[in-house]
């Protein structure tokens, strides 16, 4: 396990799940810690000001990291949180940047309520997480980049067969099953317009993207995770969070 991935895991699990926020953020972050989770201020003290009260409010914290993607200096993780015996359940997606020592220096995220029932019948976070096909990393990243451009941004849905398998499994809570359900969701007003692809990371058969979408009068940060086989998307997950108004930010913003 690379040092940066190990540090991300430990910050998440030691710092938040186990409640050792102060020691974890001091050990696993670098000279700066730029924060894009808008409720959290920059730096060690910003992290502590948010998470020490969070730990106190939520003494029962079940946190499971479902999947990791490591791409150079970046680590992406996809996690499930159940707080206080399931009184609150969340899906979180996070991207971390690191310095040359593998210490965390920047963080982006989205959080949304975990939904027990989805339109496709698939669980929001379930599914494979094994990284394989490392030799196909660059090809798969390029394929997802074109998918975002041609399908999500340009809405050339007649090209969907070039990117998605017929049996594509969809874990989006608001998309119906299959490739047709996926297209219908991307055409909907609730999905809206995919304005900007901000980051794209990949490792083997998994690729994750962060983008800004605009739907129903609001800007959102949208994470998507794709699993590919033979160059086609065979499974996908999402996590979408509305961006709070500027006067509610404690840092420079989501991006």
Predicted regions and their residues:
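C-terminal and inter-domain tail/linker signature
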Residues: 1-255
């Amino acid at each position: 396990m690379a040092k940066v991935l190990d540090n991300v895991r430990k910050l998440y699990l030691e710092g938040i799940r186990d409640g050792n926020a102060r020691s974890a953020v001091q050990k696993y972050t670098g000279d700066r810690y730029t924060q894009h989770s808008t409720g959290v201020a920059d730096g060690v003290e910003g992290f502590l000001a948010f998470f020490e009260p969070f730990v106190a409010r939520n003494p029962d914290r079940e946190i499971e990291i479902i999947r990791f993607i490591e791409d150079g200096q970046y680590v992406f993780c996809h996690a499930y949180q159940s707080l206080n015996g399931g009184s609150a359940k969340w899906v979180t997606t996070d991207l971390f940047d690191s310095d040359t020592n593998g210490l965390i220096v920047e963080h982006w995220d989205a959080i949304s309520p975990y939904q027990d029932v989805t339109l496709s019948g698939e669980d929001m976070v379930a599914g494979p997480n094994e990284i394989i096909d490392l030799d196909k990393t660059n090809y798969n990243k390029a394929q997802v980049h074109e998918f975002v451009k041609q399908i999500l941004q340009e809405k050339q849905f007649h090209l969907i067969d070039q990117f998605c398998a017929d049996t594509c499994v969809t874990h989006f809570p608001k998309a119906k099953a299959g490739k047709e359900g996926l297209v219908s969701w991307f055409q909907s007003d609730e999905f809206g317009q995919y304005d900007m692809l901000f980051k794209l990371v990949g490792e083997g058969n998994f690729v994750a993207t962060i983008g800004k979408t605009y739907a129903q009068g609001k800007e959102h940060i949208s994470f998507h995770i794709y699993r590919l086989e033979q160059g086609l998307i065979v499974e996908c997950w999402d996590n979408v969070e509305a961006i709070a108004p500027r006067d509610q930010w404690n840092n420079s913003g989501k991006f």
